Amino acid sequence: MAVPKRRMSRSNTRSRRAQWKAKPTELVGVTVAGQQHKVPRRLLKAARLGLIDLDRR
């Protein structure tokens, strides 16, 4: 793992951190029991198997 050679100032640290932005989760359409739902891609299999309640909002 890389180790910094010198201490980074608070200003530089916060400026670097400010560049990072969270992206909204991309939703994918899935049909369950004849109804169309949009779920995150990582939950597709669980939605198809009925492990998560899609009617609850």
Swiss-Prot record:
Name of the protein in question: Large ribosomal subunit protein bL32
GO molecular function: structural constituent of ribosome
Gene Ontology cellular component annotations, sorted alphabetically: large ribosomal subunit
Family, similarity comment: Belongs to the bacterial ribosomal protein bL32 family.
HAMAP family: Ribosomal_bL32
Region (Disordered): 1-22
Keywords assigned: Ribonucleoprotein, Ribosomal protein
Biased composition (Basic residues): 1-20
GO biological process terms, semicolon-separated: translation
Entries under NCBIfam families matching the protein: rpmF_bact
Domain of life, per lineage: Bacteria
